[in-house]
Amino acid sequence: MNATTYHPVSVTGKMSLKSRLSSLRFVLLLLLAQSSLADEMASDNFRLIELFTSHGCSSCPAAERLLGELLAEDKQLLALEFHVDYWDDLVHGSDGNFVDPFSDASYSMRQREYNVASLAGRPGVYTPQAVINGRFATVGSNRRDISRALTSTEPQSLKIRVDAGQTSDTLSVVVTGSAEQRAELAGINISVARYLDSATTSVTGGENRYKSLTNHRIVTSLTILGEVSEDNEMSFTLQKPAENEGCVVLVQEDASTPVYAANACP
């Protein structure tokens, strides 16, 4: 009879392997949970850059190019480009003046209102000027300052959800928050800024004469939808933006206050 040699398996080794696999699963679950929490926390923050600019300003094309680069680098970035009108009548020697086709007196007023408030950074009425979340101002072509401001934004005070509406040409906007948040911001305006996604303009006069300028997120209107209610969530129906258009919904009393919340239309 042939002898059979048995090779005992270490129970300790088995348990050690199971333990290691269990630990690995725990670590993976923990990492997933942390990632989910980070995503949730990130969604509580918003990054909105408002660029005040003009086709009549020779320093502005650099800021407009930077805005395009920032949008290409960060698909979650909210941006609104406001063209002021105070350059329209300025004569630049023999080049004359140029009336910016996107300029509006109300956008110049918005910039002035911002600078009545206590903006951090470099406040004042000038172009190009970038305002981040209605709290921080800097030169619109200063990538370093803008990037720093965009990485230190405040959490949203309310939640704005923008979804497809009941019909194919509408959007549904719902603004929610805790009872405390709604009470704190009761009466604050809820507005929608509509914009052209991009456009190129041939400038025929002023400091940028003979230049072809490409702009992004060019604001065409800023309209109040309603106010924050202390008692209920707020809901609105919007006309869906056309092709090469978009919109941003924001909670802000006026430009003398910060932007408390913002979200883009899908």
PLM region spans:
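N-terminal signal peptide c-region/cleavage motif recognized by signal peptidases
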Residues: 33-35
